[in-house]
Design a protein with these regions (language model features):
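Beta-rich carbohydrate-recognition modules and glycan-binding surfaces
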Residues: 1-138
Length: 138
């Protein structure tokens, strides 16, 4: 009866510096589900991520929704500027920028929550099986 399932990468050490790129490209077999791709960035020793980690278990994530094909592989480009800052699936409105030079972790999740105040139309309860083939940059 939970509202989401997710998987996270290990925390990157050293941090990923992707500042010479424009975005991510994901190849995924998602079986028609709408997934969320989340990215965490480090904002310094006493930065925003640490502030939000103290306020919530999920912390600050930069998120994009990914609609997948029912059959076969979905290839989707996620420009850095399309990522939205969120905490606990809620968009936040702070004057912060995505830090492509200090990426600390990736997350892929399937949630019953979609855009703020809405349910995810691609959510299906029950067993889930998807194949993340690759995450690359362009």
């Amino acid at each position: 009866k939970g509202g989401f399932v997710s998987c996270k990468s290990p925390i990157f050490s050293p941090l990923l510096n992707l500042s010479s790129y424009q975005g991510f490209e994901l190849k995924i077999e998602g079986k028609g589900r709408t997934l969320k791709f989340g990215v965490s960035c480090k904002y310094g020793i006493l930065g925003l991520k640490e502030f939000f980690l103290n306020k919530s278990p999920g912390g600050l994530r930069w998120v994009a929704e990914i609609d997948t094909k029912r059959f076969g592989t979905t290839i989707i480009k996620v420009p850095f500027e399309s990522l939205e800052p969120t905490v606990l699936a809620k968009k936040i409105s702070l004057p912060i920028k995505f830090k492509s030079d200090s990426i600390s972790q990736f997350q892929l999740l399937h949630s019953k929550f979609g855009r703020p105040g809405e349910l995810n139309p691609g959510f299906k309860p029950g067993k889930i099986n998807f194949l993340l083939q690759s995450i690359s940059v362009y």
